[in-house]
Amino acid sequence: QSIQSLYYAGNNADPRFDISKNYLGEWSKQQLYKNLTEYGNLVLLSDGEAHPLVCMEALSAGLGVVVTEWGAANLDSTKDFITIIPESKVSDIAYVQSQIINNRSYSVEHRQEIIEYSKQFDWVNVIKDVYIPIVEKIVSESK
C-alpha cells in the first residue's frame, strides 16, 4: 500500500489493509462499467489466482495488467501491456512501482491493441479454438 499512484477497488476482507489510503471501496457493476477505463492498468499481486478473470475484464477494457507469476497463466508475457512480477521481486516496492509505471505508460497509448488481444479470451473463441478441438480429439481417439 505504499505506492501512492496505486488505487484499490474491491472486496476487502483483510483487517491489516489500511482503507484510509487510496481505497475506492467495493464497486458496483455500474461503477465498474463507468470508471474502469479511467485507469491505465490493473495490478493484481496475488498468489491465489492462476487465471484471474479480473485480468480478462481489464484487458477487454483496454487496460494493461501487472501480475505475479502465479496470476500469469494463459497470458502472453511477450506483450508490452502484460507485466509479470517475479515472486522474488514482489516485496521490492521500488521495482514493482517502476514496473507499474512502465506498464501504464505503454498501455494508455495502446488500448486498441490490448482490446484486440483480449478477444482470444471471448467464450466464442475459447469454445471454437479450445473446447471443440479437445472434444473432437477425444471422440476420434475413442473410435
PLM regions: where:
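A short alpha->beta transition loop at the rim of the catalytic pocket in nucleotide-sugar-dependent
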Residues: G40, G62
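Short hydrophobic beta-strand element within catalytic cores of glycosyltransferases
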Residues: G64-T68
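Glycosyltransferase donor-sugar binding loop
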Residues: Q1-F17
